[in-house]
């Protein structure tokens, strides 16, 4: 099930006391080798809306009030770690299964470098893939609307907890 986004208007709870007074986190940036090849992947495989707004760059979006700017870096592109990933929510566990199967079947067509196994982890049912530009994507299903739930639940761990779990250490080392 795809959750309804009830109120997209938002006022950050600590904006009055902050130096910067944001009303929205508007965008992020990722690098691509080639705009044309990457656009095909983002539109045809991930289903995002793409617009070329500048000669070396494009923007993509899918829901909410947030977009990603992608910049053609060519040979200067630096691959990122799995922890530096972008999340894509789908409506059900069955849809995650279908997407995982499609990702494996269409690796060559879209230049997908790697598709990791599906797992139940950190409260979601998901898998990760690495695209043609070394960007990591997590395709996940979550019962509810994770964006709201994470903030509604509030802090679940103290900032004084210093130990990094073996799971996170393994992900950082690329052992996932």
Name what the model sees in each region.
Residues 2-36, 86, 145-176:
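N-terminal beta-strand motif that seeds the catalytic metal site of vicinal oxygen chelate
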């Amino acid at each position: 099930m795809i959750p309804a986004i009830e109120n997209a208007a938002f006022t950050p709870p600590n904006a009055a006391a902050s130096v910067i007074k944001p009303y929205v986190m508007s965008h992020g940036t990722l690098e691509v080798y080639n705009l044309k090849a990457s656009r095909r992947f983002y539109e045809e495989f991930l289903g995002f809306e793409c617009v070329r707004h500048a000669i070396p760059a494009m923007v993509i979006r899918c829901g909410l009030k947030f977009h990603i700017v992608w910049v053609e870096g060519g040979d200067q592109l630096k691959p990122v770690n799995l922890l530096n990933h972008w999340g894509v929510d789908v409506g059900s566990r069955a849809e995650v299964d279908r997407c995982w199967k499609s990702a494996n079947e269409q690796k060559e067509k879209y230049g997908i470098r790697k598709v990791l196994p599906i797992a139940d982890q950190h409260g979601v049912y998901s898998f990760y893939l690495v695209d043609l530009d070394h960007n990591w994507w997590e395709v996940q299903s979550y019962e509810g609307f994770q964006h709201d739930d994470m903030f509604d639940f509030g802090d679940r761990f103290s900032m004084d907890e210093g130990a990094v779990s073996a799971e996170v250490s393994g992900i950082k080392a690329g052992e996932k």
